[in-house]
């Protein structure tokens, strides 16, 4: 049985050295140049930071070439990369640094080194890049069962857990994605999502495994992304709903080169899908988690309207099962989504309790609720922890949010349960509005689309909704926004 592979970047630089690997701010870099830059960073990390095989290096960088070098440099040294969210607070990062037992924190301007020096050795990436590199003998192979990256769950509930993503997980994810989406020599994958998020990071590994350029953006800007798609002939883009909405608002026709918009972060509402179809945007809806190293389920565009709201079918070599009380559910029966496949993490770092709760007979319990139809298409209903039980009836916030998003005045919607003396809990809606609207109008609008018990008892206007790094709505924080009730 295969247990190791040649280091992906080393082999890619040998196979296609002059092929474009990375495009950033209109500057191009070949795979030969990417390997050279990554090897130099590895040499500096070894020489000045004493990073070595078996260590963990935490990376706190924005989307930039040095972030790409840093990840590959860790692998060239045989070290694990701990990806830190740039949006977290100091206390949240300190917890992850301590929990991961990182030896080094690699950071950039904008973060205060002094805040972390009591917990871990620190290095500024720009200062490090200015030092003489020297030379190293890189680790020529990767062991598939070894942890490549440690990425913390977004913490929609409870404290974050370190997800151990192996080289085998990342490789299987890349291969399964290629079998699903196809790969051509023309492909260029645009990433404007953060590289500390699995949807962004996974594209770096696809790049070296496929021999495909990544067009990297520091952050998402509608104008910049549309310009980049045109000038670099981008064929694939990873996106979340807010990004897709922004692109649709600015163009009447999908850019000609674009063949795939891989959409994550939750089911797309009907009005958005209808606009995508009208403008011929090739949206592939997907379902995935940090624990599955990106998408594990994908819906092709030809099914997007016939299977409205579905996340699709599992990628090749992956499986889905819906369970209730440990037993498989029949088609259309609601239960917990469980998954199995070579891209599923090997476990949470030093969290035996969480691993025992999450795995059962090889199946990973996602904590999400859903069902399979009679053709095996997955429909994701909601997080189990977000379910609202009102007078004995189950209310899925995502269903209520989808109804509200169909209203022309509603740009974003979040729904959570609020304590009620009669019903136990009732839904409250938190809305980002584009124009004024009354609660009476919204109630009437919902009445045409939802059962009476699902209609929000109150509506609140907010400036923005709380989201994690994966752009997933953090419904447990919505009640903190309880002001500005619509009359």
Swiss-Prot record:
Pathway: Quinol/quinone metabolism; 1,4-dihydroxy-2-naphthoate biosynthesis; 1,4-dihydroxy-2-naphthoate from chorismate: step 5/7; Quinol/quinone metabolism; menaquinone biosynthesis. One of its GO terms (biological process) is fatty acid metabolic process. SUPFAM superfamilies: Acetyl-CoA synthetase-like. Keywords: ATP-binding, Ligase, Menaquinone biosynthesis, Nucleotide-binding. Pfam families: AMP-binding, AMP-binding_C. Its EC number is 6.2.1.26. InterPro entries: AMP-bd_C (IPR025110), AMP-bd_C_sf (IPR045851), AMP-binding_CS (IPR020845), AMP-dep_synth/lig_dom (IPR000873), ANL_N_sf (IPR042099), MenE (IPR010192). The keyword Nucleotide-binding applies. GO terms for molecular function: ATP binding; medium-chain fatty acid-CoA ligase activity; o-succinylbenzoate-CoA ligase activity. Belongs to the ATP-dependent AMP-binding enzyme family. MenE subfamily. PANTHER family: 2-SUCCINYLBENZOATE--COA LIGASE, CHLOROPLASTIC_PEROXISOMAL, ACYL-COA SYNTHETASE. Converts 2-succinylbenzoate (OSB) to 2-succinylbenzoyl-CoA (OSB-CoA). This is 2-succinylbenzoate--CoA ligase. The gene is menE.
């Amino acid at each position: 049985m295969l247990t190791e592979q040649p280091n992906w970047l080393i082999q890619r630089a040998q196979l296609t050295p002059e092929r474009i690997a990375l495009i950033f701010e209109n500057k191009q870099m070949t795979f030969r140049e990417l390997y050279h830059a990554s090897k130099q960073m590895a040499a500096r990390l070894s020489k000045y930071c004493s990073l070595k095989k078996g260590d963990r290096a935490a990376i706190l960088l924005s989307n930039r070439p040095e972030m790409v070098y840093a990840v590959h440099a860790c692998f060239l040294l045989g070290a694990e990369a701990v990806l830190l969210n740039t949006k977290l607070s100091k206390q949240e990062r300190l917890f992850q640094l301590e929990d991961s037992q990182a030896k080094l924190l690699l950071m950039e301007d904008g973060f205060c080194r002094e805040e972390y020096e009591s917990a871990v050795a620190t290095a500024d990436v720009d200062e490090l890049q200015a030092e003489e590199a020297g030379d190293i003998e890189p680790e020529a192979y990767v062991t598939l069962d070894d942890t490549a990256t440690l990425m913390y769950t977004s913490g929609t509930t409870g404290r974050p857990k370190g997800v151990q993503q192996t080289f085998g997980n990342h490789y299987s994810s890349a291969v399964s994605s290629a079998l699903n989406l196809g790969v051509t020599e023309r492909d260029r994958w645009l990433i404007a999502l953060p590289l500390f998020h699995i949807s962004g990071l996974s594209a770096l590994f696809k790049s070296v495994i496929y021999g495909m350029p990544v067009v990297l953006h520091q952050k998402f800007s509608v104008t910049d992304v549309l310009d980049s798609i045109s000038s670099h002939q981008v064929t694939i883009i990873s996106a979340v709903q807010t990004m897709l909405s922004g692109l649709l608002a600015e163009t009447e026709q999908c850019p000609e080169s674009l063949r795939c918009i891989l959409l994550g972060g939750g089911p797309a509402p009907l009005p958005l899908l209808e606009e995508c179809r009208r403008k011929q945007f090739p949206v592939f809806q997907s379902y995935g988690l940090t624990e599955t190293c990106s998408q594990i389920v994908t819906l092709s565009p030809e099914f997007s309207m016939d299977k409205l709201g579905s996340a699709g079918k599992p990628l090749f070599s992956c499986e889905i099962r819906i369970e209730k009380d440990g037993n498989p559910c029949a088609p259309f029966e609601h239960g917990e989504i469980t998954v199995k496949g070579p891209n599923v993490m090997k476990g949470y770092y030093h969290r035996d309790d969480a691993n025992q709760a999450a795995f059962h007979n090889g199946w990973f319990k996602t904590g999400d609720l859903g069902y399979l139809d009679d053709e095996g298409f997955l429909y994701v209903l909601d997080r189990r922890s977000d379910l609202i039980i009102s007078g004995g009836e189950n209310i899925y916030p995502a269903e209520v949010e989808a109804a509200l998003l169909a209203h022309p005045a509603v740009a974003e919607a979040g729904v959570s349960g609020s304590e009620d003396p009669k019903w136990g809990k009732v839904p409250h809606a938190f809305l980002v509005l584009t124009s004024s609207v009354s609660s009476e109008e919204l109630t009437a609008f919902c009445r045409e689309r939802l059962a009476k018990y699902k209609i929000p008892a109150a509506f609140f206007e907010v400036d923005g909704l709380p989201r994690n790094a994966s752009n997933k709505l953090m419904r447990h924080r919505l009640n903190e926004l309880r002001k500005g009730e619509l009359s």
